[in-house]
């Protein structure tokens, strides 16, 4: 008998999948509430969303993690498995996830719909083109770029300074060659030559806007507030001044609607939006989460990368827009990541190393302290891998007990919802404890410097911030325009609490270096670029795409 471990797509391809209309029935919705995209995917109509507005909200559980290894620590897997486990506990549960980006799917991740026996399906569709949301966002973003270049070509009534355009084109791929380009070459009729560049679609401000807009009216307002660049007087120019917010809203009207799918165990899953947490705010859409809260007793959602990135942004940026804080936070930790933080080489993470695990435990400690700073009860989910030794598991459990950290050994990758029943019990207990006393770590009225200081000292564990001369000048400019009242969205490496990806564990006495700010007024925040973080990733030497294929029957291979 073969002991070969099945791949995610092998598991998903033989799973029983129910019609999405049946999944909707579990939520009390009939077929008329859906806009079908085939048999197993649907969007929730605006009428449906509007009909739920007066319903009581359920309980919200946020899943985050420690600082990850490049392969990720199974946050989506735990989110799905916990949702299935809560369903087994007779809690009416809805999972709210982000949509995967094609860039990392083709690059390093190979997919992002959970893993093993804790997946959302149809995973092939979700990982590739899904319902076309990302394509619509890409089209809207690049339409705006075309409108800008056309305006300059056709007389430039607004006096747009081509040297000071901050709006970039996007593509939903990892393509380092497009980071900096020149457009408008070829003579007078081909446009006005200028420097430009591409970001990945998930870093687009329009992606953030889709994920923070409450409805079509709010979407249009936010689009109008996008700053595309500056005129020759160095004054900001917005989409509203150009007059294209209506056209952009038209392109995005369907992309704003949340998508309904299911898990392998048929728990309803609303999958919508997908900003990265290292270069954007890292949370699925407000529309998806708020709709899920009206449909379920329990909603399990996630925020990208570690608690220093996704969770901080969820709590400081998304919660005010959502109008509800999490009732409990789950922090996903893996033995392999803790060993990495304790000094083990990336090539040796599958080998037993109890000493490295003990040293790396400080990274987990810091993240638990950060969540407590926000006043929210938490549970650590030890996401068990088949390479974890019994001695390592015992040591991590011992360390958690010694430090009073609530935890649960979680085996949802191998066992699905059954592997998360203890975690579900502890989450339910934390939610029902009523201990949630949410507080943001800064107020919007604070200065940019004060907000940065709060994030760095309270969440990262650093001692302060160092601003480049450009960043210092920008702060003066932003105060003049009133932009200093917006929340801060840090663009930072996901691998370290600092802005140095090689500084692992729990570093101390470090400063965060801010090289530049980007106003994202439509999204409603100011991005602070730290270190060398890129808004357009590159591909690894051997992309995951090398292992992807499709057979003669149209079945995908190599998605994992």
Curated annotation (Swiss-Prot):
One of its GO terms (molecular function) is ATP binding. PROSITE patterns: FTHFS_1, FTHFS_2. SUPFAM superfamilies: P-loop containing nucleoside triphosphate hydrolases. InterPro entries: Formate_THF_ligase (IPR000559), Formate_THF_ligase_CS (IPR020628), P-loop_NTPase (IPR027417). Its EC number is 6.3.4.3. Belongs to the formate--tetrahydrofolate ligase family. This is Formate--tetrahydrofolate ligase.
């Amino acid at each position: 008998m073969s002991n070969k471990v099945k791949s995610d797509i092998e598991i998903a391809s033989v799973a029983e999948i129910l019609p999405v209309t049946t999944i909707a029935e579990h939520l009390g919705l009939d077929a008329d509430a859906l806009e079908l995209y085939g048999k197993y995917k649907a969007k929730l109509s605006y009428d449906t969303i509007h009909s739920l507005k007066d319903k009581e909200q359920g309980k919200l559980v946020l899943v985050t993690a420690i600082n990850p290894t490049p392969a990720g620590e199974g946050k989506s897997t735990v989110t799905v498995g916990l949702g299935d486990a809560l369903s087994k506990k007779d809690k009416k549960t809805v999972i709210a996830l982000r949509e995967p980006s094609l860039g990392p799917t083709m690059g390093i991740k190979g997919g992002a719909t959970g893993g093993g026996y804790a997946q959302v399906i149809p995973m092939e569709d979700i990982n590739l083109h899904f319902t076309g949301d990302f394509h619509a966002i890409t089209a809207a973003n690049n339409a705006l770029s075309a409108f800008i270049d056309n305006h300059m070509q056709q007389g430039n009534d607004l006096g747009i300074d081509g040297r000071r355009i901050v709006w970039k084109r996007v593509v939903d791929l990892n393509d380092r060659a497009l980071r900096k380009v020149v457009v408008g070459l070829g003579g007078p009729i081909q446009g006005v030559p200028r420097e430009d560049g591409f970001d990945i679609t998930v870093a687009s401000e329009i992606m953030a806007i889709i994920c923070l807009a409450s409805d079509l009216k709010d979407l249009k307002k936010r689009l109008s507030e996008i700053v595309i660049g500056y005129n020759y007087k160095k004054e900001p120019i917005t989409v509203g001044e150009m007059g294209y917010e209506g056209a952009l809203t038209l392109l995005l009207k369907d992309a704003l609607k949340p998508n309904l799918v299911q898990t392998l165990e048929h728990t309803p899953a609303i999958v919508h939006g997908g900003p990265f947490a290292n270069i954007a705010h890292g949370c699925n859409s407000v529309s998806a989460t708020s709709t899920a809260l009206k449909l379920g007793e329990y909603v399990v959602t996630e925020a990208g990368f570690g608690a220093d990135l996704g969770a901080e942004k969820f709590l400081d940026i998304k919660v005010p827009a959502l109008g509800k804080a999490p009732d409990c936070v789950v922090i996903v930790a893996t033995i392999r990541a803790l060993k990495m933080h304790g000094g083990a080489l990336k090539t040796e993470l599958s080998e037993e190393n109890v000493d490295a695990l003990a040293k790396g435990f400080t990274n987990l400690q810091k993240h638990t302290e950060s969540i407590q700073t926000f006043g929210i009860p938490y549970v650590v989910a030890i996401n068990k891998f088949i390479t974890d030794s019994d001695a390592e598991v015992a040591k991590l459990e011992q360390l958690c007990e010694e430090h009073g950290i609530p935890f649960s050994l979680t085996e949802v990758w191998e066992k699905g919802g059954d592997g998360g029943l203890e975690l579900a019990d502890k989450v339910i207990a934390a939610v029902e404890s009523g201990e949630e006393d949410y507080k943001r770590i800064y107020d919007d009225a604070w200065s940019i410097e004060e907000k940065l200081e709060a994030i760095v000292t309270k969440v990262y564990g650093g001692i302060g911030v160092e601003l480049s001369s450009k960043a210092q000048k920008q702060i003066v400019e932003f105060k003049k325009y009133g932009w200093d009242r917006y929340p801060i969205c840090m663009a930072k490496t996901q691998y370290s609490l600092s802005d140095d990806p090689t500084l692992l564990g729990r570093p101390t006495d470090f400063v965060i270096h801010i090289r530049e700010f980007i106003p994202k007024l439509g999204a409603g925040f100011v991005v602070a670029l730290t270190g060398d973080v890129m808004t357009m990733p590159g591909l690894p030497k051997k992309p995951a795409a090398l292992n992807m294929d499709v057979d003669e029957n149209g079945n995908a291979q190599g998605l994992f």
